[in-house]
C-alpha cells in the first residue's frame, strides 16, 4: 500500500489548490501548435517594454560571477532602497518577489491566528495564510474594492495580520490616502497591516512616498516589487519596509540567498534608472486605447489604477477565454477570484492591445 502523502500535510495545505499563473507563451504554443511569435500575452501584468537597457548591461556584467553565491544580506540593494526612502537598511527585507514577503509574514504568524483580507484580493493571501495554519477571514467587497470598515469589524483577539493590496489585484481599485489613514488610526497596534503596493507606481509614479507612513504606524509593513513597472518579473525581486523589529522577525524565517545574484544586480541598476514605461506617461495612451476599444464593444470594466483592467463580459468568461487562446491571445480569467464573468487584461503595447480587441470582437460575434 502506497503512502498517502497528502495526509502527512498540515490541514491548511490539504485544502489548498496550487496557484495558477498566467499561461506561458511556450505552453500555449505547445498545446495548440501556434508559432510563439504570433502569441500575445496580456495575462500577468508585465511591462511590455522590458527593463531599462542599463539593467541588461548590469546583468551581462555579472554573468562571469555565477559560480559564486549572491550576497545573502542584499547589502547594496537594501542600502539603495533605504537611501531612496529615507529609511535605515535594517528596515528593509528583500524577497523573491513581493509574494515572498507575504509568505514570510504568514509563516511568522503561524497556526492559530487569523488573517483578514478582502474578497477579490490577491490569491497569495489565502494560500500563504492557510499553508501556515492560520485562518483566512475574507471580508465581502464593496464595488469590488476593500471594505475598510468591514475589515475593522472582522478583527478580534486572534487577528494577527491584515492584507490590503493597493491598488488591488485583480480589480484595480485604490484606497485613497485619507481613507487609508483613518483605517490605520483605528487598527489595534498589535495587528500587523501589510500594505501590498505591487502596482503603486502606476498610480503615483516611481517617486511615490507612501513609505513615510511607517513613522506614524509602527505596525505597518509596505511591500513592493520590481516585477511590474521596472520590468524584472523574470528575475523575481521584491522588498518590504517596516519597523526594524518587524524586519528582524521576517529575516529569521527568510530563506538563505532568497534573491539571486542577477536579480540583485538588476534591481540595483533598475532602481537607479527610471522606468521607460512610465517616462513621459508612456503607458497612458495604451490604457485609453484599450478602454475606447472595450467601450466600442459595449463592454464594462472596473476603473483601474494598475496596469490592467478587469473586463466584465456579462456572461461566463471561460468560453470567451478559450476562444482567445485558440487565436493566440492570452489573458487572465478570474473566476477563482469570484469574478466568473470577468477577464483581467494587462495593458500592452498599442499593437498588442489592438490584437486583443480584434480577437475579442471575433470571439464575441461567434
Swiss-Prot record:
InterPro entries: Aminotransferase_I/II_large, HisP_aminotrans, HistidinolP_aminotransfase, PyrdxlP-dep_Trfase, PyrdxlP-dep_Trfase_major, PyrdxlP-dep_Trfase_small. One of its GO terms (molecular function) is pyridoxal phosphate binding. The keyword Transferase applies. It catalyses: L-histidinol phosphate + 2-oxoglutarate = 3-(imidazol-4-yl)-2-oxopropyl phosphate + L-glutamate. Belongs to the class-II pyridoxal-phosphate-dependent aminotransferase family. Histidinol-phosphate aminotransferase subfamily. PANTHER family: HISTIDINOL-PHOSPHATE AMINOTRANSFERASE (PTHR43643:SF3), HISTIDINOL-PHOSPHATE AMINOTRANSFERASE 2 (PTHR43643). This is Histidinol-phosphate aminotransferase. It comes from Stutzerimonas stutzeri (Pseudomonas stutzeri).
